[in-house]
């Protein structure tokens, strides 16, 4: 296979770095933890997340994005779950995205998907159901870690 020629010109060879934060939202339902999953406009299932605003901490961004994308309030931060990263191309440019996920708890059930941002559905699911729905392996691993954190918190308290 012939070697590809290097791109030249403005922005060639540069990777755009993006930092996001999101929430693994959990709610207690009759003694069982249920997790919030959202569906985007591409029909992919995952978690609420988005870019950090200027001067905003990752924790604050995670809480803001969860509230904006799902309509939930009464959100309680439980701490960092994991940081994942991935690469993708957008308009011909390579993007390296880093996303910090936090465990967030709520007592509220009713959600309101933010359709203007491409959120087409919100669902509360058990770990097993959420894990089966989630579209990406790295997000599934974050869910597993969040579930482990909830179990550790229950057994310790």
Residue ranges of model-derived segments:
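A periodicity- and composition-biased signal for non-globular, repetitive helical segments
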Residues: 10, 55, 103, 146, ...
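Feature targets compositionally biased, intrinsically disordered low-complexity regions
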Residues: 8-12, 21, 30, 78, ...
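Charged phosphate-binding loop/patch that engages nucleotide di/tri-phosphates or the phosphate backbone
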Residues: 132-157
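N-terminal strand-loop-strand
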Residues: 2-47
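Unchanged
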Residues: 52-141
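Residue-level detector of intrinsically disordered, flexible termini
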Residues: 2-5, 11, 20, 60-61, ...
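Residue-level marker of positions within ordered structural domains that often coincide
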Residues: 28, 107, 148
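A generic structural signal for ordered secondary structure
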Residues: 34-36, 80, 147-151
């Amino acid at each position: 296979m012939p070697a590809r020629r290097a791109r030249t010109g403005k922005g060639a060879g540069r990777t755009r770095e993006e930092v996001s934060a999101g929430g693994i939202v959990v709610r207690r339902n009759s003694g069982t933890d249920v997790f919030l999953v959202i569906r985007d406009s591409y029909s992919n299932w995952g978690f609420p997340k988005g870019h950090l605003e200027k001067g905003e901490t990752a924790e604050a961004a995670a809480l803001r994005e969860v509230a904006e994308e799902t309509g939930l309030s009464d959100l309680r931060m439980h701490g960092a779950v994991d940081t994942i990263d991935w690469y993708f191309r957008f308009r011909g440019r390579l993007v390296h995205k880093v996303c910090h996920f936090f465990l967030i708890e709520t007592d509220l059930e009713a959600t309101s998907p933010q359709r203007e941002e491409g959120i087409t559905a919100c669902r509360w699911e058990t770990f097993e159901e959420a894990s089966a729905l989630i579209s990406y392996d790295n997000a599934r691993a974050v869910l597993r870690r969040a579930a482990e954190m909830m179990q550790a918190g229950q057994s310790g308290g």
